């Protein structure tokens, strides 16, 4: 009899929870419509995978790409709408969050065609790969719109779990296993530190979890200048630092870049930084409003260390992927300048614009690494010598992306850095901008060194890998080269017409 009553109570409680969830989704689902499209795409992928054979592989790519493009379209249709807080305060929809979601979706859309040939050549499981990519994209989008501490913790964990699985996707590769283990351990440690910081914020604000309510709670409890807030600030900075990978929280980055499948590295190198930057701007700017001087100082230290260490160590690297790992550490130092400048002096607008250019520059470079690696099986920088003699398109497109990463005019990277540094200079960050300018010159050196190798025509310098290099027979049907072409165009042409892009970015400020 007791068991029967308990069973009835359990059924009633479950029904209430289900009805509440259905009610929330019914009345708030339109606010996360782009995310719902991705969820539908995930379900469709699983259904097709369970009912079809490997001959239907093209459908998997089509469904994934279509889901991402439809999600981008839904975001664009929602542009300029009034900011809305939904799901009982868990999510906030505004232009600032949506443009970061757009950047994540754009990166994922470009990464799928970049991965097609790699998956076919390495015989990786296609369905799981695409599921992890879409789920990680979903986690990044939820993180961009997160408005409370619980969602800010759960969303990046969704992204991180998929990242761990993707980085260890080539299970027979010892380097991949080592990178995944290191990534998992450091990711778990950083998540623990992040939660520790959240607990201090929660307690100091009197039990509030929404970002704006935390500020009100700190005012009511008079705890906004307490030691607990300082502990929370340091802990959260460390936790977010792992996602952004600035120095000295960069230890996992070179190993994961080198050991993971190259399309996975291309995906993680941008999406993780975009999502973490969106979260960092809101966490630092809202709950830590009264500690702006303290977090500005912390981020300035991280930016200086990242720009100096990242670019100096990149010079010494012999692996192309490790070089890009340290280059990305330097690049995040430039992005942090925009976070520090903030809403004033168009800091956020310049940061968003530079991130848009960084996606195209970085993915274009990784597309070249994927293409060259599949045909030669090497990642060593020296083995690229003389590539221009065998594949002029690949060599020239690589050179343009590298020059744009270095910030040479008139490419997009130059104008992106110029506006970012100018905003920092107007905000009085003279020392930080000076370090950025000097380290940009250093980065040009190692990018030009690679370009010199690509363009060399002397037979004695051409490596056996390039001598035996075979070009793709169907260039128009090569998805890697399609991705690379899009990235090269985006790395060059937008730099000439910056004002419309900056104007759109300025409209995203909250």
From Swiss-Prot:
GO terms for biological process: ATP synthesis coupled electron transport; photosynthesis, light reaction. It is found in: Plastid, Chloroplast thylakoid membrane. GO terms for cellular component: chloroplast thylakoid membrane. It is a multi-pass membrane protein. Its EC number is 7.1.1.-. It catalyses: a plastoquinone + NADH + (n+1) H(+)(in) = a plastoquinol + NAD(+) + n H(+)(out); a plastoquinone + NADPH + (n+1) H(+)(in) = a plastoquinol + NADP(+) + n H(+)(out). Coiled coil: none annotated. GO terms for molecular function: NADH dehydrogenase (ubiquinone) activity; quinone binding. InterPro entries: NADH-Q_OxRdtase_suN/2, ND/Mrp_TM, Ndh2_N. The chain crosses the membrane at residues 24-44, 59-79, 99-119, 124-144, 149-169, 183-203, 229-249, 295-315, 323-343, 347-367, 395-415, 418-438. Pfam families: Ndh2_N, Proton_antipo_M. Keywords: Chloroplast, Membrane, NAD, NADP, Plastid, Plastoquinone, Quinone, Thylakoid, Translocase, Transmembrane, Transmembrane helix, Transport. NDH shuttles electrons from NAD(P)H:plastoquinone, via FMN and iron-sulfur (Fe-S) centers, to quinones in the photosynthetic chain and possibly in a chloroplast respiratory chain. The immediate electron acceptor for the enzyme in this species is believed to be plastoquinone. Couples the redox reaction to proton translocation, and thus conserves the redox energy in a proton gradient. Belongs to the complex I subunit 2 family. NDH is composed of at least 16 different subunits, 5 of which are encoded in the nucleus. This is NAD(P)H-quinone oxidoreductase subunit 2, chloroplastic. The lineage of its organism: Eukaryota, Viridiplantae, Streptophyta, Embryophyta, Tracheophyta.
């Amino acid at each position: 009899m007791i068991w029967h009553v308990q069973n009835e109570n359990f059924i009633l409680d479950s029904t209430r929870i289900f009805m509440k969830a259905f009610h929330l989704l019914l009345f708030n689902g339109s606010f996360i419509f782009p995310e719902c499209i991705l969820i539908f795409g995930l379900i469709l992928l699983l259904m097709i995978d369970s009912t079809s054979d490997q001959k239907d592989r093209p459908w998997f790519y089509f469904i994934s790409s279509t889901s991402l493009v439809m999600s981008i379209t839904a975001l664009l249709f929602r542009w300029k709408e009034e900011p809305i807080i939904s799901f009982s305060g868990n999510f906030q929809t505004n232009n600032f969050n949506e443009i970061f979601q757009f950047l994540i979706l754009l990166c994922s859309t470009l990464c799928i065609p970049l991965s097609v040939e790699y998956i076919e050549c390495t015989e990786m499981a296609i369905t799981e790969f695409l599921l992890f990519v879409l789920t990680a994209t979903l986690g990044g989008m939820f993180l961009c719109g997160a408005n409370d501490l619980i969602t800010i913790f759960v969303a990046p964990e969704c992204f991180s779990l998929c990242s761990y699985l993707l980085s260890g996707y080539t299970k027979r590769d010892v380097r991949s296993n080592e990178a995944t283990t290191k990534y998992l351990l450091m990711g778990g440690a950083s998540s623990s530190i992040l939660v520790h910081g959240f607990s201090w914020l929660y307690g100091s604000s009197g039990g509030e979890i929404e970002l704006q309510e935390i500020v009100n709670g700190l005012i009511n409890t008079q705890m906004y200048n307490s030691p607990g807030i300082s502990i929370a600030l340091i802990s959260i900075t460390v936790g977010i630092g792992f996602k952004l990978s600035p120095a000295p929280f960069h230890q996992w980055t070179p190993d994961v870049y080198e050991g993971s499948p190259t399309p996975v590295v291309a995906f993680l190198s941008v999406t993780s930084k975009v999502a973490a930057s969106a979260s960092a701007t809101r966490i630092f700017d809202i709950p830590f409003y009264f500690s702006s001087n303290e977090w500005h100082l912390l981020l300035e230290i991280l930016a200086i260390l990242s720009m100096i260490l990242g670019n100096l160590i990149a010079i010494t690297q012999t692996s192309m992927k490790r070089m890009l790992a340290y280059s990305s550490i330097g690049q995040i130092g430039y992005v942090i300048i925009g976070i520090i400048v903030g809403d004033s002096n168009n800091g956020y607008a310049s940061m968003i614009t530079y991130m848009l250019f960084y996606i195209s520059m970085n993915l274009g470079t990784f597309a070249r690494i994927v293409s060259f690696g599949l045909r030669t099986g090497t990642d060593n920088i020296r083995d690229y010598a003389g590539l221009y003699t065998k594949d002029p398109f690949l060599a020239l497109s690589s050179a343009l992306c590298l020059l744009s990463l270095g910030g040479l005019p008139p490419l997009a990277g130059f104008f992106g850095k110029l506006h970012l540094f100018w905003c920092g200079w107007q905000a009085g960050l003279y020392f930080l901008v000076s370090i950025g300018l000097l380290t940009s010159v250093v980065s040009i050196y190692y990018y030009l060194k690679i370009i010199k190798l690509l363009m060399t025509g002397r037979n004695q310098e051409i490596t056996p890998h390039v001598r035996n290099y075979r070009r793709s027979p169907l260039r128009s049907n090569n998805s890697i080269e399609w991705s690379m072409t899009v990235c090269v165009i985006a790395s060059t042409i937008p730099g000439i017409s910056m004002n419309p892009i900056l104007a759109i970015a300025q409209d995203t400020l909250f």
